[in-house]
Swiss-Prot record:
Residues 32-60, 240-309 are annotated as: Disordered. It comes from Saccharomyces cerevisiae (strain RM11-1a) (Baker's yeast). The keyword Transmembrane applies. Its main location: membrane. GO terms for cellular component: cellular bud neck; fungal-type vacuole; vacuolar membrane. Keywords: Membrane, Phosphoprotein, Transmembrane, Transmembrane helix, Vacuole. Belongs to the PRM5 family. This is Vacuolar membrane protein SCRG_03194.
Length: 314
């Protein structure tokens, strides 16, 4: 048995195009000024498709809603946590910061002006005092009534001290030898050199000799009693003992030891108010007038000691 395909018969009926009906409903409800609700509803119905064999019908409905909110700041009335800036200008923070920075700069400027004024005044005061001291030194007592100097009262004691210092310098300069301004060593015996021998102790010996000569001049002014010349006799005895003990040369004393000894003797005489031993030694002149053969009989250490003490001239 052969099975054949069965094809149903369909009868088509001609008809017109369907009509489309759309219904739109919109409702707006406004309850408060702070919110608004908009709702739209649309309903659409599709035409139904009918046929002799099949019959179908369909429908669709859609709805949408949108909520829009408006922001409003809270009221500042009676609220302690919110700054009421309605009565304040704009940029209050910037104005405050600028005022603080300006105050700092103004304080620095005032400090600089005050310090410069004080330093200038101090400098002028010192310079005027020094100028007046140099100008009126020695005769400020006679010219104080002619000029009004505000520093005379405060510096009277210093002026008197300067006068005494100048007088003492004048007295000491009377006994000083003339020195060449072009010689940095200020040695008056360099031009009178009689040999080519150069000694490292020459400057020390010449200085000690000149110092002893000035000291002898000062002592000769105030000492007139011949009974005080006992020191010369002691020096002569020591010189004789040195000549006898040529076989036992003594150790040469350094300039520092001699200087300390002189200073100690001066302190002793100042404490006891005595001038014994400060008389110039007469044997120094006798050694200079002695013949040169005496140097050959002396030991080198003794000769160096005499040079350091100013008794010998190279």
């Amino acid at each position: 048995m052969v099975k054949k395909n069965f094809i149903p018969s369909v009868s088509l009926v001609r008809r017109d195009l369907p009509t489309l009906v759309t219904t739109t409903t919109s409702s707006t409800a406004l309850s408060k000024p702070t919110s608004s609700v908009v709702s739209e509803t649309s309903s659409k119905s599709l035409p139904s498709l009918t046929s002799s064999a099949f019959s179908t019908s369909s429908g669709a409905t859609s709805s949408s809603s949108l909520i829009v909110a408006s922001i409003t700041p809270p009221s500042t009335a009676g609220n302690p946590f919110i700054l009421n800036a309605a009565d304040k200008p704009n940029g209050t923070v910037y104005i405050a910061v600028g005022a603080v920075i300006g105050a700092i700069f103004i304080s620095i400027l005032i400090w600089w002006l005050v310090s410069s004024y004080l330093s200038r005044r101090f400098t002028m005061t010192n310079s005027y005092a020094n100028d007046s001291k140099n100008l009126y030194r020695g005769h400020h007592k006679h010219s104080s009534s002619l000029q009004s100097n505000p520093f005379d009262i405060n510096d009277e004691k210093s002026y008197m001290q300067d006068d005494w210092d100048s007088m003492s310098q004048l007295e000491s300069s009377q006994y000083e030898d003339a020195a060449s301004p072009f010689n940095p060593i200020q040695d008056p015996f360099t031009d009178n050199r009689r040999s080519l021998f150069i000694s490292p102790t020459l400057q020390v010996s010449q200085y000690e000799k000149s110092h002893s000569r000035h000291q002898s001049k000062d002592t000769n002014i105030f000492i007139d009693d011949p009974s005080l010349y006992v020191g010369t006799y002691l020096e002569e005895e020591e010189e004789e003992e040195r000549k006898l003990n040529l076989n036992r040369p003594q150790r040469a004393a350094s300039p520092e030891r001699k200087e300390k000894k002189i200073n100690s003797m001066e302190g002793y005489h100042k404490r006891n108010q005595s001038s014994l031993g400060l008389i110039p030694v007469a044997s120094a002149t006798s050694n200079t007038s002695s013949p040169k053969k005496a140097h050959k009989r002396q030991a080198p250490s003794m000769f160096l000691d005499d040079v350091l003490n100013g008794r010998e001239i190279i």
